[in-house]
């Protein structure tokens, strides 16, 4: 385990894809040693990031996701070798019950210039699929959305690449350390430090990138139980 610094500008909790991608991005602004410190309870990619399926796509029904996912794909494309990213594209092959929804996704992709093809009709879909896989046999397919970008990556290798990109820019990743609480300002609720089982690290800002464990930190921070969405 690395030694815990006594202070940092930003402390990030969690060594998965959220924590390390944030660290990498922040390292482009904060360039001094220990400006950005990542605290990880076990090891990088030890949680959900290490068991993710690895598919990289822009195939979500929510319109708000479209440009965000297009940006995400471009990050994967920026260094495919390091990220162990394979840009083979992505296929959504669907029966009639999904036709309308998939057509909506295609329209949204087209509106932002995201390259994809949309094939409709059972006959044309069969022809298209056999053009790629001559032993294709699935019946009842009435739409194929073929994203020309996207593909897949090897999850743990990808997270390791994020760690390497971060640490090469001066980020310190401390592993085997457990966050136990937060230090507050004397006259406010502002967080001024992170308490751990290895001591306290003072900081100006905290980023919680703990994935499914975010509830524990939410409770430590005594934030409201209900969240009202307007």
Identify the role of each PLM range.
Residues 27-49:
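Glycine-rich FAD pyrophosphate-binding loop
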Residues 23, 27, 165:
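Gly/Ala-rich phosphate-binding loop of Rossmann-like dinucleotide-binding domains
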Residues 53-132, 141:
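Dinucleotide-binding Rossmann-like beta1-alpha1 core, especially the glycine-rich loop
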Residues 18, 44, 213:
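Conserved Rossmann-like nucleotide-cofactor binding loop
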Residues 145-205, 209-216:
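Helical element adjacent to the flavin cofactor pocket in flavoenzyme catalytic cores
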């Amino acid at each position: 385990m690395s030694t815990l610094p006594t202070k940092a500008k930003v402390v990030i909790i969690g060594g998965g894809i959220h924590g390390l991608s944030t660290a990498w991005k922040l390292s482009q602004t904060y360039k001094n040693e220990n400006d950005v410190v990542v605290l990880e309870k076990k090891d990088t990619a030890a949680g959900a990031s290490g068991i993710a399926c690895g598919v990289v796509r822009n195939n979500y029904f929510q319109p708000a996701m479209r440009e965000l996912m297009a940006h995400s794909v471009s990050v994967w494309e920026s260094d495919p070798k390091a990220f162990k990213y394979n840009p083979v594209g992505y296929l959504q092959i669907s029966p009639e019950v999904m036709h309308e929804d998939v057509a909506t996704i295609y329209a949204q992709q087209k509106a932002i210039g995201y390259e994809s093809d949309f094939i409709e009709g059972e006959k044309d879909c069969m022809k298209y699929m056999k053009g790629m896989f001559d032993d294709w046999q699935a019946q009842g397919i009435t739409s194929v959305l073929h994203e020309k970008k996207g593909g897949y990556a090897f999850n743990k290798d990808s997270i390791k690449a994020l760690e390497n990109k971060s640490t090469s820019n001066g980020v310190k990743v401390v592993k085997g350390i457990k966050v136990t609480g937060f230090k507050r300002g004397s006259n406010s609720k502002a967080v001024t430090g992170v308490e751990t089982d290895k001591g306290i690290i003072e900081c100006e800002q905290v980023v919680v990138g703990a994935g499914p464990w975010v509830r524990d930190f939410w409770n430590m921070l005594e934030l409201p139980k209900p969240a009202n969405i307007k």
